[in-house]
Design a protein with these regions (language model features):
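Charge-rich, low-complexity N-terminal segments
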Residues: 1-154, 162
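A short beta-strand->alpha-helix segment at the C-terminal rim
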Residues: 228-238, 245-251, 279-310
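Intrinsically disordered, glycine/charged-rich C-terminal tails and inter-domain linkers
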Residues: 124-125, 132-134, 285-351
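Alpha-helical scaffold within the catalytic cores of cyclic-nucleotide enzymes
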Residues: 68, 177-191, 208-245, 270, ...
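Catalytic NTP-binding/metal-coordinating core of nucleotidyl cyclase/transferase enzymes
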Residues: 142-213
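A short glycine-enriched loop-to-beta-strand structural element that forms part of the catalytic core
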Residues: 74-76, 80-85, 238-256
Length: 351
């Protein structure tokens, strides 16, 4: 059997009658498929434990995910090969904690609130792959390191060190967060996973058959940033936000890397380093995307690829052809020298 524990919040405040109705309906539906459990309700929080055959539990969870009264569903734990039920006599017992004066019940309500808040915070600092393992009932620390094929994305802000020395620290931090937010959302929308942030850099990976999606994430990011530049005021740092992306494809080491103090679930290898070299190359070729022949050949969609030349990149044994994409947002690129010249001219005008 399978057991799932989750927390969710309600999209609006529910009355006692509505919560009781949810409990009654759940009891009837769960009894039909042999699912047992308990539902705790405290203010806007639902905490529920479901147990039964895996297919039946997943069916109940699918209905819950689609229920418009739930939002922010967070699976705390999933257990497989469960042999004994914790709530064998309850198809769904509902416990309403609101309004109870009993100190124990109040403590439980506060605990649920704190658990939810803590998990939401941890989510923001944790790689999606690690969260996925946890929701599947897998201890991430036990996942073995493996060799796999991936499309690697490496991106960062052009002339960041120079710009960060000219503008207020608050505006610099805002710019980095903005860049990482836009890029990360595009990566996630197209099926990639952010592996890590290193200063103003983002490292992500896509499955080997999703090279098109990796390019889409880069192109759409560049388009959105181009729009930001066009609408920003002359003295705003966003006016000078340019970024570059390197895309490579090949074998990487994927898994837990770190120490007893701090672990990362990440990717390592020559292909990751190559993506970083390609990102740096974008300044030289004057285009926001630089990608390898392997990435180009893995694409299934009709892209307007441009051969930017053959380059002998650091760490590579021989020169190799490098490509970009012919898109207005991709070719709207400036290097460090061009950005510093624009900023210097602006400073002269202001003084």
């Amino acid at each position: 059997m399978k057991r799932i524990m989750y927390i969710s919040t309600t999209t609006r405040k529910l009355t006692d009658e509505e919560v009781e109705a949810i409990g009654r309906k759940s009891t009837v539906n769960n009894a039909k498929v042999g699912v047992t459990g308990v539902l705790l309700s405290a203010n806007e929080f639902f905490f529920q434990i479901l147990e039964g055959e895996e297919e039946d539990v997943e069916g109940v969870m699918e209905r819950i995910r689609k229920d418009p009264r739930h939002q922010g569903l967070l699976i705390l734990k999933a257990e497989y090969e469960v042999t004994n039920r914790l709530f064998g006599n309850w198809s769904m017992n509902t416990v309403r904690l609101d309004g109870m004066s009993d100190m124990l019940m109040q403590a439980v309500r506060i605990m649920l609130e704190n658990i939810t808040e803590t998990h939401r915070i941890i989510e923001r600092y944790t790689q999606p792959a690690v969260l996925q393992f946890m929701t599947e009932g897998i201890n991430p620390l036990t996942v073995p390191v493996k060799k796999t094929e991936q499309v690697i994305l490496f991106g960062d802000i052009v002339a960041f060190s120079y710009l960060s020395g000219l503008f207020p620290v608050e505006e610099v931090a805002e710019l980095v967060n903005l860049f990482l937010d836009i890029t990360s959302k595009k990566i996630a929308e197209h099926g990639g996973q952010v592996t890590k942030y290193v200063g103003d850099c983002v490292v992500a990976h896509f499955p080997p058959d999703r090279a098109d999606d990796a390019i889409k994430a880069c192109v759409e990011t560049l388009r959105e940033i181009q729009e930001l530049r066009q609408t920003a005021g002359q003295c705003r740092l966003q006016k000078y936000l340019y970024c570059g992306f390197g895309l490579s494809k090949g074998p990487v080491i994927e898994g837990n890397i770190g120490s007893s103090i701090k672990m990362d679930y990440t990717v390592l290898g020559d292909i990751v380093n190559l993506a970083a070299r390609l990102e740096s190359l974008t300044r030289e070729i004057g285009k926001g995307i630089a990608l390898t022949e392997a990435v180009r050949d893995a694409c299934g969609e009709s892209w307007s690829f441009v051969h930017t030349g053959d380059f002998n990149l650091k760490g590579q044994n021989a020169s190799q052809p490098i490509y970009s994409v012919n898109d207005p947002a991709v070719v709207d690129m400036k290097n460090f020298q061009e950005i510093s010249t624009i900023v210097s001219e602006l400073c002269c005008e202001l003084t």
